[in-house]
Amino acid sequence: MDAEWKPGCPEWTTENGSQIAEQKRLRVLERLVRKDYTKPPSAELVKSWHKEMFQGIAPHSDYVGQFRDKDLTSYCLQDYEVVVGDIPGTDSSRVLLEVEAFFKDFNERLNILESSFPSGSVRPPTLNEVSEIIKLAAWAHGEWVRIHPFANGNGRTARLLANYVLVRFGFGPALAIRPRPDQPYGKAARASMKEGDHSLMEAVIWRLLAESYK
């Protein structure tokens, strides 16, 4: 990932304390599986995951638990633009608007799905319902990486969002937070970010979910 760095704002391309970072990721995933899946999806929820994962790990406190923005008081995130390969994330001037629209859409999609298959249902989902659950997980993941709201750690939070959907509807967290899943996942994430096409990610989640039950 490339980014525009300001004077006094350290580049965030590596993590300090890999063992500590792994412990933090596991705590966040455990928290999601234990209680967070019952909460409505929101910017504050995802910010709290990011903060718990990266507090003391990111090279500058401005980067932790805050979205890129044009008018932030956090100097290092003002006008902060990201590019993954040759694909730019959402312009910093539009990040907050797109994040707000994302969670509005996410909650609407979740409510529609729960109207036919409520989370916590005692019956198993039909094949069509499983397909809809996976579509929602892939959509949430793909839209998050398309926006790329954070300075770094967007893929990890996208995988947490996909796992959030799966766990909410009775499945296990099929997407590893770190290391990143295999190359088909990378290709699918790129298609989501560049083209808004989440169909490849749907196929990846189907496979990872099936493998998690072997």
Describe every region a protein language model picked out.
Residues 1-214:
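FIC/Doc superfamily catalytic core
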